[in-house]
């Protein structure tokens, strides 16, 4: 059932296939036809266009055959049903449930996982709306103007990429309420550069660590906490945690609020969980 790609006969065919020259592929009328054909309609009037990728009909056919050899659709169906797909760590893979449900209910330890993720999204929505409309203010009584996410790896890269991708849209449509910033480097000069450019009295911080023990993230938290205290501010009044329910950060009075994720959502896929949902909802609104 599970076979490495380089063990598949069709993978060798792919390696031997000729890579198309995009400069030639996109020229003239044939290029215009390629742009039209290599486009897939998606939701909200958007399209995924792959005309500028180094593929052609021959490569697409080989990729389809490789997907068939690997039983890709069957494996995807098993992922949707909550079977153990992460064989290395013996875990389910459930990031898709933060976006929608295409399969049957996934129950773990008596808990409906889709319901759990929706509950966390509701908490994030309510909190972000309260921050954005001024119901929850900074300790000074002023509205929060900025949000800083403290994380590393998937807790940083995905949310950061989505924020940068949406920033211009948010500004153009008057959706950007809190400017977002990110601290991941354990070099204190990096964090100091971010913090020195902000009005700390109106800045909210999000600490992201699934285990609650990530050394690099906790090191940055301590640095930020010291920075705030030196400015006469109380970190507990300006910091929220995104973590697991069993983490030492959960329901900790050192944080203004806590939002939860779990081991079934890997870091690189966590942008639509509370990991990315909190900072993006604060910046652009929950919708």
Q: Model-derived features: where do they sit?
A:
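Extended, charge-enriched "interface" segments that sit outside catalytic cores
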Residues: 2-140
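Glycine-rich phosphate-binding loops that contact phosphosugars or nucleotide phosphates
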Residues: 126-134, 140-287
């Amino acid at each position: 059932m599970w076979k490495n790609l380089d063990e598949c006969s069709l993978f060798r065919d792919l390696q031997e296939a000729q890579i198309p020259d995009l400069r030639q592929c996109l020229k003239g009328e044939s290029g215009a036809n390629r742009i039209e054909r290599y486009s897939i309609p998606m939701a909200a009037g958007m399209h995924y266009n792959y005309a500028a990728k180094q593929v052609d009909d021959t490569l697409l056919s080989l990729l389809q055959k490789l997907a068939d050899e690997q039983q890709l659709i069957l494996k995807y169906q098993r992922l949707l049903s909550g079977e153990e797909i992460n064989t290395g760590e013996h875990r389910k893979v459930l990031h898709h449930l933060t976006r929608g449900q295409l399969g049957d209910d996934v129950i773990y330890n008596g808990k409906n996982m889709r319901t759990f993720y929706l509950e966390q999204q509701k908490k994030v929505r309510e909190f972000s709306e309260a921050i954005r409309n001024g119901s929850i203010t900074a300790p000074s009584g002023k509205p929060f103007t900025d949000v800083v996410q403290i994380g590393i790896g998937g807790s940083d890269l995905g949310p950061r990429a989505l924020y940068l991708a949406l920033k211009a849209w948010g500004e153009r449509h008057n959706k950007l309420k809190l400017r977002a910033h990110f601290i991941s480097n354990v070099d204190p000069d990096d964090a100091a550069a971010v913090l020195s450019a902000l009005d700390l009295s109106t800045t909210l911080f999000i600490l992201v660590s699934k285990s609650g023990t990530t050394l690099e993230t906790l090191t940055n938290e301590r640095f930020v906490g010291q920075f705030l205290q030196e400015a006469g501010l109380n970190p507990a009044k300006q910091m929220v945690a995104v973590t697991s329910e069993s983490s030492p950060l959960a329901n900790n009075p050192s944080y203004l609020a806590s939002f939860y994720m779990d081991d079934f959502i890997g870091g690189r896929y966590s942008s639509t969980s509370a990991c990315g949902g909190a900072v993006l909802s604060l910046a652009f609104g929950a919708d």
